[in-house]
Amino acid sequence: MLKVQQTADGTGKCLTTTMPIRRDTAFHLIRQYRPATEKTYTSVQIGINDSIEEFYLAHLNHSCEPNVIVDTKKLELRAIRDIAPGEDLTFFYPSTEWHMAQPFQCSCGSPRCIGKVSGARDLPLNLLGGYFVNQHIGAMAMEHLIGAQKLKTPIAV
């Protein structure tokens, strides 16, 4: 069902499907993974301090108009719209990554393109709120917001 192949522009690899996938379908269970000892270009953050490496996740590219959710609680890939055979499978990297090991300039071409992809930490909450984000990212965003609000509060002497 899942296939790793060369990207259309020939610059890398991508993950595609050989069969149609219907919206809201969990189509891959993430079970054959190993804990990542450090963040890498191919690791996926699944908790506040935990990242993993997995073959298919390593080939799942970013898009600001994704067709897949990486659900780090259920450890599954789920379609967020109908996906046709041969279509590149993509997810929104800040949905799992707070701070990325290797930020990059997005070239997805979407009207929703965020430009530099460096992790959820660097995105405004109103923009992040337009996407599915995993529980650990939501928790870290709230902690970040609360910390920023505390800095704005005058200190009584």
Predicted regions mapped to residue ranges:
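Conserved catalytic SET/PR domain of SAM-dependent protein methyltransferases, capturing the structural core
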Residues: M1-V157
